[in-house]
């Protein structure tokens, strides 16, 4: 998955998707999370497909911190605040002593709430 991770870091999401399809490690929660992230962040996002990959990642690993964070951010894009808050609660349990993913999703939720009247 390293080449795909490098493409994501370079914000070349189309290349990341291509590399992930070649790697075809669909039994890996990390693979599903990276695919979901790349689909969500590409120039023309595909939120419905990204959501399917996040759900698959969480079915494989219910405590996958990256998938919990990124799926929560996707839900905010779909105006599903309650869903994002549920994922934040799951992240809180997955991060025994706090973690970056929890803080990032918490910040995204706060920003989302600040924009709503």
Could you tell me what each predicted segment is?
Residues 26, 60, 93-97:
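Structural marker of alpha-solenoid helical repeat scaffolds
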Residues 5, 37-39, 73:
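Residue-level recognition of tetratricopeptide repeat
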Residues 31-33, 67, 101:
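TPR alpha-solenoid repeat register
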Residues 34-35, 70, 104-108:
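Canonical tetratricopeptide repeat
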Residues 1-23:
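Alpha-helical segment of the N-proximal tetratricopeptide repeat
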Residues 10-15, 43-56, 78-87:
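Structural signature of tandem alpha-helical TPR/SEL1-like repeats
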Residues 9-10, 41-43, 77, 94, ...:
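Register position in tetratricopeptide repeats
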